[in-house]
Amino acid sequence: MRAEEKNMVERIMNTETMGYAYEYPYGGGARKEYMLALTPENLANFIGARGYDAKKIVITDVLDRLIVNTCMGMLDICPDQKLCGRIIEYLAPIQLGEKEAGEILAVERNVADEYFAMEDEEVTMAECQML
């Protein structure tokens, strides 16, 4: 795992709002999976940067509860209307071309899985040393 990937995973975890994004490309093909921070600004940056390249993006929390669903770059389903309003505050200027999407706190899902496996291994090694 590269140092910048490890750093990004730790930055996502420091937001205390991590979840998963599933990006479905136009014309089919394999979906792309990401772990990302679920802050309104980060969600807007992710959707604003990737939304028009994807037919659909589904974002869930770590318990697989729907946070937001997009269709062709537009918010479609957002169960928490307060969160939806906060996402729109950041997303609308991006969609209107008034500003570029900012930094996105996200890594591919396999990178996150590798990080957690590495973390589990370190915990196991520490426990073995205590014996």
Annotate the PLM regions.
Residues 125-131:
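Non-Sec secretion/translocation targeting segments of pathogen effectors
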Residues 22-34, 38-106, 110-111, 116-123:
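Acidic, low-complexity, intrinsically disordered interaction modules
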Residues 14, 18-24:
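A short beta-strand micro-motif
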